[in-house]
Amino acid sequence: MGLDWVLDKHKARPGFEDRYATVTQRLADMRNDGAESPDLEEELKKISISCYETVGAPRVGIDEEATEWYRKNNYEPAQADAKAGKLDHRPETKEFWLRPFEELLEEHKGQYVMELAREKGGEAAVSGIAVQSIDFRGKMMRYVEGLEEGLVNEAWENHTAEECVDYAKRLAGVLPTIPDGPEGKELLQGAIDWLNFWGSRGFGYWAWY
């Protein structure tokens, strides 16, 4: 069974905690019923702050440094591959990257660049292919050598921000007993760092499996 710790991407702005809890619960109930509420979605944006905003990640098309990062790290390399024929086997992708920069910039406007975030450490040491780079591949806890079963199984539970910090504390407590190596201390330390980083900033995760 797979598992990703999908980070809660928003939290309540100070003073709006109760309303935030009400709105998020109402939206969750509506989604379960296949319904939508644009008004509630808009209100949620106003009373919440994103994880990206919290760590100071700049935005493509809005902040110059993020725009240049997108040009140099995404657009220019991909367009060079397209012109060199490396994308000939994927004609739609080739056509996509051969478009003018301004056109693609408009489509990606507002995209956050975590690599340039003011506060470093938010990206996961291990991430799944179906989630974002800030979501931790929780399934890897199953492969930490010597980790007791109770702490492994807890990975499959949703965690609030406070619970993330507590989980990290308990994992850190057993870290000295874990063997060295990429499937030992290194892997567990990555999980601890991720839990502490986001939990201490007010963000929890939901277990997606």
Where are these regions (language model features)?
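Acidic (Asp/Glu-rich) sequence patches and key acidic residues
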Residues: M1-R201, W208-Y209
